[in-house]
Amino acid sequence: MRIMLLGAPGAGKGTQAQFIMEKYGIPQISTGDMLRAAVKAGTPLGLEAKKVMDAGQLVSDELIIGLVKERVAQDDCAKGFLLDGFPRTIPQADAMAAGGIAIDHVVEIDVPDEEIVKRMGGRRVHPGSGRVYHIVFNQPKVEGKDDVTGEDLAIRPDDEEATVRKRLDIYHEQTKPLVEYYGAVAAKGEATYNKFDGTQSVAKVSEEIVAALS
């Protein structure tokens, strides 16, 4: 069960990733975690990646694909894996296919931009404890104040509307070609491609994912 997860920031991808991992007993492969682990383990590819990152440069697709191949060959990936946030571009998707890393299912969680802006723009955080509130979905007892300390709540820079919209623009720009790419792969019968409505309840989305993957 080799799954690739697509979804904009704030679409609820992390929650479904956790669910898929537990349900199918497969690990999540995130390129950031993988890079850090390879650097820490001091593997030849990890050392190469460290050299590039220490120089303040971007790690090449070739190197990332090498790390992914190394990672999926590990024992815990015997039943499959969940790729999150990779590939991001068509060259990466091509390199993955050329490297023999096949995908069985593409799962896209779709939430309209305005809904994401509402979700993320409504988040408030208590800087001291990291407690998170939401002006619509999880309101503090007193508006703008932390329930425990009564201190002021803040908006994280990442949650400001302009930042959220910019991240969404980048996501759509990067992902639209990938959606078409994997749509074509699915049309050839080499994988399944399913799009889920992420505005539904978490449980409903999970239920639909299981139905589509079984």
Swiss-Prot record:
Region (NMP): 30-59
Cellular component terms (Gene Ontology): cytoplasm
Listed PROSITE patterns: ADENYLATE_KINASE
Residue numbers binding AMP: 31, 36, 57-59, 85-88, 92, 156, 167
Keywords: ATP-binding, Cytoplasm, Kinase, Nucleotide biosynthesis, Nucleotide-binding, Transferase
Pathway membership, UniProt: Purine metabolism; AMP biosynthesis via salvage pathway; AMP from ADP: step 1/1
Subunit and interaction comment: Monomer.
Matching PANTHER family: NUCLEOTIDE KINASE
Amino-acid positions noted as binding ATP in the UniProt annotation, renumbered to this chain: 10-15, 123, 132-133, 200
Domain of life: Bacteria
Cystine pairings recorded for this chain: none
Name of the protein: Adenylate kinase
Gene Ontology MF: a single term: adenylate kinase activity
Subcellular location(s) of the protein: Cytoplasm
EC number: 2.7.4.3
Function field: Catalyzes the reversible transfer of the terminal phosphate group between ATP and AMP. Plays an important role in cellular energy homeostasis and in adenine nucleotide metabolism.
A Pfam family this chain is assigned to: ADK_lid
Catalysed reactions listed for this entry: AMP + ATP = 2 ADP
Region named LID: 122-159
